[in-house]
UniProtKB/Swiss-Prot annotation:
Keyword Lyase: no
Family statement: Belongs to the metallo-dependent hydrolases superfamily. Urease alpha subunit family.
SUPFAM superfamilies given in the database record: Composite domain of metallo-dependent hydrolases (SSF51338), Metallo-dependent hydrolases (SSF51556)
PTM comment text: Carboxylation allows a single lysine to coordinate two nickel ions.
Protein encoded by which gene: ureC
Name listed for the protein in its UniProt record: Urease subunit alpha
Organism: Bordetella pertussis (strain Tohama I / ATCC BAA-589 / NCTC 13251)
CC per GO annotation: cytoplasm
Length: 571
């Protein structure tokens, strides 16, 4: 029998499991180590494409017709996913959906084949690469269209939010106000290779004014203090949501003008709501909106500027608040408003609450106190910081960080999908879901993508000089691919409300994107947040702003240096 060393095997086919012990992969330049939990491939029967390799007619490629074969296979990939786990497998894609996770090849010549390769099958070499589900960003201010290219370049494939461009209202709030703007923005977003969903303006105590936006195609409603986050508007908005099965997102009342945090909680009446930037620097009852992370009906999220807590976090936030919310630094009241939102103690506690699974979702707040291209990056920087400061999580060891890795990847994949009723199509690497997949070189994990697939078609990839003789010469840049053009844009989805699908005005928009209704939004609770469902009793000292969870003081230091930072962006 011919033998191969473990290191040589990993170089050729990627990491594996031998004798119950998995190979380990470092994520970028962090302290995080992922250990392979299972390998679906079979030693000696691996498939690989290339000259002299296995995927050839009569060998790893069968003679079967397209109906029996996958359209695309990703070979020997390391999947990192909150639901599927950290596993090595071949991934089959058929009709834009993930059709198999297992062993690819030719069943006429190989044992154990669950994914059939034929003449109609394209191959993406996954050896040595990590595959994740595309990120879902639920806090997008649709200010400029160039955000989308930036988002794709960092692995985001679903963008949910609101706005109409650089209008003053959109610079501050994530809502697309009214049926006319809703139609115009759905048509504009039809030109881009990402899944999209729009929030209508939820800040109204008029039932009809909210319902007409949902009928016009809003997948959810956003309550924002700049438009009014009063108990009356909260109650009315949640009433409409309960009727139409959509999600409500909230940016609550920083100034406590219409009531304190207890009044806002009372207005919820136990109904499900998605709390944006729940720490509070991005907005919300000062100083104690962070208490919402301990409520079973609240789905708590962070926006990325406060994540993780570093020596620069406090300083940059004051200017961000002033610009974003149209404040005047010469007006004392405006300055006091901004300063009330920025608290070292609650920002530090936010890191720990993420690490313990009390905060469930990460998002960007793009161009409105957040960076659209850093949702993935800052999630992993936070995980690194917490390992450095707090050590291994329960279930982890000095050898690997699988539990922490699965907890953190859930924050921008499956949990936002569950929160907004789209988990039946996106959010995890599972059979039956859209093949919205991101391939990463481990050294660049979370920083710069290798390739982004939308429904199995490449829409963005790291490619060299297009005038060169091969695809690798410098400058290697992340560029739009064929899936970004023409009618291939149909590989993406526009998420809307169920009630809007029966509205002729929506069907007459003539969108390339497939319209899909959100579902099950109102039955979701914190318990449904995968690997992030801890419900501590959270309190905030009103004088010192110190945060306690189940009576324990949450405190951590700001970092002076982070991984996934300057060394990756010198060019």
């Amino acid at each position: 029998m011919t033998r191969i060393s473990r290191s040589a095997y990993a170089e050729i086919y990627g990491p594996t499991v031998v004798g119950g012990v998995g190979d380990r992969v470092r994520l970028a330049d962090t302290l995080l180590l992922a250990e392979v939990e299972k390998d679906h491939t079979i030693f000696g029967e691996e498939v690989k494409f290339g000259g002299g390799k296995v995927i050839r007619d009569g060998m790893g490629q069968s003679q079967r017709l397209a109906t029996d074969c996958v359209d695309t296979v990703i070979t020997n990939a390391l999947i990192i996913d909150a639901v599927t786990g950290i596993v090595k497998a071949d991934i089959g894609i058929k009709d834009g959906l993930i059709s198999g996770i297992g062993k690819a090849g030719n069943p006429d010549t190989q044992p154990g084949v669950t994914i059939i390769i034929g003449a109609s099958t394209e191959v993406v070499a996954g050896e040595g690469l990590i595959v994740t589900a595309g990120a879902i960003d639920t806090h997008i201010h649709f200010i400029c269209p160039q955000q989308i290219e930036e988002a794709l370049a960092t692995g985001t494939t679903t963008m949910i939010g609101g706005g109409t461009g650089p209008a003053t209202g959109s610079l501050a709030t994530t809502s697309t106000s009214g049926p006319w703007h809703m139609a115009a923005m759905l048509q504009a977003l039809d030109a881009f290779p990402v899944n999209v969903g729009l929030f209508g303006k939820g800040s109204s105590s008029s039932h009809g004014a909210l319902l007409e936006q949902v009928r016009a195609g809003a997948m959810g409603l956003k309550i924002h203090e700049d438009w009014a986050s009063t108990p009356a508007s909260i109650d009315t908005c949640l009433n409409v949501a309960e009727e139409t099965d959509i999600q409500v997102a909230i940016h609550s009342d920083t100034l406590n003008e219409s009531g304190f945090v207890e009044d806002t909680f009372a207005a919820f009446k136990g109904r499900t709501i998605h709390s944006f930037h729940t720490e509070g620097a991005g907005g919300g009852h000062a100083p104690d909106i962070i208490r919402a992370a301990g409520m079973p009906n609240v789905l708590p999220a962070s926006t990325n500027p406060t994540m993780p807590f570093t020596r620069n976090t406090i300083d940059e936030h004051l200017d961000m608040v002033m610009v974003c919310h149209h404040l005047d630094p010469s007006i004392a009241e405006d300055l006091a408003f901004a300063e009330s939102r920025i608290r070292r103690e609650t920002i530090a506690a936010e890191d720990i609450l993420h690490d313990l699974g009390a905060f469930s979702i990460m998002s960007s707040d793009s161009q409105a106190m957040g960076r659209v291209g850093e949702i993935v990056l800052r999630t992993w920087q936070t995980a690194h910081k917490m390992k450095l400061q707090r050590g291994p999580l329960q279930g982890d060891s000095e050898r690997s960080d699988n539990e922490r890795i699965k907890r953190y990847i859930a924050k921008y994949t499956i949990n936002p999908a569950v929160a907004h009723g789209i988990a039946h199509l996106v959010g995890s690497v599972e059979v039956g879901k859209l093949a919205d997949l991101v391939l990463w070189k481990p050294a660049f994990f979370g920083v710069k993508v290798n390739m982004v697939l939308k429904s199995g078609m490449a829409v963005s990839a790291s490619i060299g000089d297009m005038g060169a003789s091969i695809s690798t010469p410098q400058p290697v840049q992340i560029r739009p691919m064929w899936g970004s053009h023409g009618k291939a844009l149909r590989t993406s989805v526009a998420f809307v409300s169920q009630v809007s699908l029966s509205n002729p005005a929506v069907s007459e928009l003539g969108l390339n994107k497939r319209l899909e209704a959100v579902r099950g939004c109102r039955g979701v609770t914190k318990h449904d947040m995968v690997r992030n469902n801890w419900l501590p009793a959270i309190s905030v000292d009103p004088q010192t702003y110190q945060v306690y969870a189940d009576g324990q003081l949450l405190r951590c230091e700001a970092l002076a240096e982070l991984p996934m930072a300057q060394r990756y962006f010198l060019f």
